[in-house]
């Protein structure tokens, strides 16, 4: 993956999911923050509060293919990545449902992917201007 080989070093990210991240990313100026990337992916929680009850629900909009790629990475990490399994166990003990845990995990993965893409795009841009 010549576009951003660092993505393949992340646990749970394969060639297909990395390609989807790059396709959705498109270029450096398209997405201005990691929150915007999460919103684009549909993994940013939406407030669904009522009265004194403060809740968040899943966002069903956004780039569904990007969301599916994040979901695939999350499932892979839950099965094979020890740190993610420990995180899920801790959140279960806190009373979170498996759906909430996956939502939080997908948001964290989106943050991690955004940082990798942003760093790669900046270094590639600097190399292009230096040449």
Regions found by a protein language model. Name each.
Residues 1-131:
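A detector of single, family-specific signature residues
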């Amino acid at each position: 993956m010549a576009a951003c080989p660092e993505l393949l070093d992340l646990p749970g990210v394969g060639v297909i999911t990395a390609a989807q991240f790059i396709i959705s990313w498109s270029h450096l100026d398209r997405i201005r923050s990691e929150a915007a990337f999460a919103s684009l992916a549909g993994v940013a929680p939406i407030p669904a509060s009522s009265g004194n009850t403060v809740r968040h629900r899943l966002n069903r909009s956004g780039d569904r293919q990007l969301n599916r790629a994040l979901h695939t990475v999350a499932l892979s990490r839950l099965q094979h990545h020890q740190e993610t399994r420990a995180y899920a166990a801790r959140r279960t003990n806190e009373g979170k449902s498996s759906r909430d845990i996956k939502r939080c995990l997908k948001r964290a993965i989106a943050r991690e992917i955004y940082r990798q893409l942003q760093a790669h795009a900046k270094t590639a841009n600097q190399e292009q201007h230096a040449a």
